[in-house]
A protein has these predicted regions:
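Donor nucleotide-activated moiety binding/catalytic core segment of transferases
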Residues: 1-42, 51-52, 56-62, 67-103
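Non-catalytic N-terminal targeting/anchoring module and adjacent flexible stem/linker
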Residues: 110-111
Length: 111
């Protein structure tokens, strides 16, 4: 059927139209996810519950908002509105390069 788009194509179309992406990690999940990489490489803001994301070299509070509460309060909603109005900061290309598939593949093959 020609009306059915491949999953990736549909996701990419939605990401391009979005100002910000939302990532909710499961309890115990650590590390960065595909959603984080999508935000980085499509130059989108990210709202996440991944507290450890602050430890990564690409973290910038203008670009990534970390939800600390399990229950979102009115204060959190105000903070998110403020975050969405902040100007997104460009991430250095050398930092981004470290999160490409090619870089990871070379790193794995060289170890």
């Amino acid at each position: 059927d020609k009306d059915i788009k491949p999953y990736a194509e549909e996701v990419i179309t939605k990401i391009k139209k979005s100002k910000c992406l939302l990532e909710i990690n499961l309890e115990g999940q650590e590390g960065i996810t595909l959603r984080t990489l999508e935000a980085l490489f499509f130059n989108k803001k990210l709202i996440t519950n991944n507290i450890k994301i602050k430890e990564y070299d690409f973290y910038n509070e203008n670009n990534i908002y970390v939800i600390n509460d399990k229950n979102i309060s009115n204060e959190t909603l105000i903070e998110i509105k403020t975050f969405l109005k902040l100007k997104k900061q460009k991430i250095n290309d050398e930092i981004l390069k470290k999160y490409t598939f090619e870089f990871w593949l070379k790193k794995v093959l060289n170890n």
